Amino acid sequence: MNKKILVVDDEESIVTLLQYNLERSGYDVITASDGEEALKKAETEKPDLIVLDVMLPKLDGIEVCKQLRQQKLMFPILMLTAKDEEFDKVLGLELGADDYMTKPFSPREVNARVKAILRRSEIAAPSSEMKNDEMEGQIVIGDLKILPDHYEAYFKESQLELTPKEFELLLYLGRHKGRVLTRDLLLSAVWNYDFAGDTRIVDVHISHLRDKIENNTKKPIYIKTIRGLGYKLEEPKMNE
């Protein structure tokens, strides 16, 4: 079955261009031209990925992203912005977008991003043949449990609501427990490209993870900042 992509943009020429190129690459494409229509189609069509413009009528892309995440709809979101402004990019990522691109862009570049995001989601997604009691490869760090084969993570026995990118980052940290990982390394390993050196993307996602597993985000005991270097995930110490 072909993967389904929801393309949301109020510029008809961009929608037509993206739809044509994505369909040529073998995807089923549905479209929306405003934020309200995007929310409705996301809820009813359950796409595998959304290509979402920031500047939209009725509801902008930032609000659409926010509402989708509030409804626990965790499919990947690739945001498009005509503004080369850090505010748009960082805010979108803070609200749960997985990736962004700045206009103008080439259709080939969009196809490459879509393919990479879907491939990572597919690799991380649980197999339909997986039994519930299969826990091979689980990573346990204090009260945190990561189940790579099930694409799930738990903290104090409660399942965490994570976006695909948050899970991939947590999993990479967990697989390298106790190691200091630079922001550049995390960009390369989790995002597969360097975002032109924009390491704030890592910081935003680390902040999201801390919100979900740290009792005090100002004094984290799991995900530690190593000043001037990066981050590491470690076992909490008894006196912390």
Curated annotation (Swiss-Prot):
Cellular component (GO) terms are:
cytosol; protein-DNA complex
DNA-binding region location: 136-235
Q: Name one GO biological process term.
A: phosphate ion transport
**Which Gene3D superfamilies does this entry report, sorted A to Z?**
3.40.50.2300, 6.10.250.690, Winged helix-like DNA-binding domain superfamily/Winged helix DNA-binding domain
Q: Which InterPro entries match?
A: CheY-like_superfamily (IPR011006), OmpR/PhoB-type_DNA-bd (IPR001867), Sig_transdc_resp-reg_C-effctor (IPR016032), Sig_transdc_resp-reg_receiver (IPR001789), WalR-like (IPR039420), WH-like_DNA-bd_sf (IPR036388)
The residues covered by the Response regulatory domain are 4-118
Q: Which GO terms describe its molecular function?
A: phosphorelay response regulator activity; transcription cis-regulatory region binding
Which keywords fit this entry according to its UniProt record?
Activator, Cytoplasm, DNA-binding, Phosphate transport, Phosphoprotein, Transcription, Transcription regulation, Transport, Two-component regulatory system
Q: What does UniProt say on post-translational modification here?
A: Phosphorylated by PhoR.
Q: Name one Pfam family in it.
A: Trans_reg_C
**Subcellular location(s) of the protein:** Cytoplasm
List residues modified as 4-aspartylphosphate: D53
Going by the entry's taxonomy, the superkingdom of the source organism is recorded as Bacteria
Q: Which residues cross the membrane?
A: none
| Chain's role | Member of the two-component regulatory system PhoP/PhoR involved in the regulation of alkaline phosphatase genes phoA and phoB and of phosphodiesterase.
Q: What is this protein called?
A: Alkaline phosphatase synthesis transcriptional regulatory protein PhoP
Please name the source species. Answer: Bacillus subtilis (strain 168)
